[in-house]
Amino acid sequence: MENKDGFLVINKDKGCTSHDCVKQIRKLLNTRKVGHTGTLDPEVIGTLPIAIGSATRFIQYLPQGKTYIGQIKLGIRTNTDDIHGEIINQKCWPKISDEKLDQYLNKFRGLIKQIPPKVSSVHVNGERAYKKSFNNENFELAPREVKIDELILMKWDQINGIIELKINCSAGTYIRAIARDLGEILNSEGCLLQLKRISACGFHEKNSIKISDIKKGIDQKNASNFIIPTISALNHISTLILNKEEDINFWQTGRAIKFDINYFNEGNNFDNKKPIKVVDKRKMLLGIGFLNKELTNINPKLVLNAK
């Protein structure tokens, strides 16, 4: 396969780790330069964007929002905050209407503080929390601020104590923590029953593909059709077009470009804190830059094909 730069949107199966997916893609495409955009727990299914080749350098510039559909089981608390952990407490759940339950969900909308599950990849004194947990070490995790942009009650099964939610949230949000904390707020217990990620970093499940289908594509010589060009993943970023060879040469040798609003696509917003994608007149991606504080120059931050 000739073009190995861009993003593959994997539809991850249950039981497979994010790193397992990366290893399989490395082997299939015969390249070491592969990385995922954010870990999915093994039991979580759905959208896992994977960067290939030079696209790995652009992961930090992707949109950070993620959307999940999950089910929470009330009445059960586990040591992992999901149904697969060891049960540490059980408690009846309340009889409650959809309307009242939705009012409780207001506590999780907007900017909130949450304590990550102890079985998580959060670092504690240089070590992953899950390792400390498996070694039965005593430790505490500090609350972290996350943002829940959208929290929709999809279904409430009173008989079985199962809540189905759609959650649009910032990177770093733990849905398991929401399950645990919602159980406490309802004077019960709660754990995550199942979870599917339907979008991440600007990629949606409708564009995702099973790894088994990639294998078939390689056999049929059309696997490159599955790769999304890096520039297509950066549509949310303002675009600077360099038409002059002199400017392109300046850029590729790491020198600043004089800011000219005429170089920008119409309607673009810009300031010195937002990244700018730089392209040539053929719309080929050249890299990422930032305006200086004086708004006079665009300084290279990431340069493709540097000289």
From Swiss-Prot:
EC nos: 5.4.99.25
Molecular functions per Gene Ontology: RNA binding; tRNA pseudouridine(55) synthase activity
Protein name (Swiss-Prot/TrEMBL): tRNA pseudouridine synthase B
UniProt keyword annotations, A-Z: Isomerase, tRNA processing
Domain of life: Bacteria
Catalytic center residues: D41 (nucleophile)
Catalytic activity of the protein: uridine(55) in tRNA = pseudouridine(55) in tRNA
Its biological purpose: Responsible for synthesis of pseudouridine from uracil-55 in the psi GC loop of transfer RNAs.
Broad class of enzyme this protein falls into: isomerase
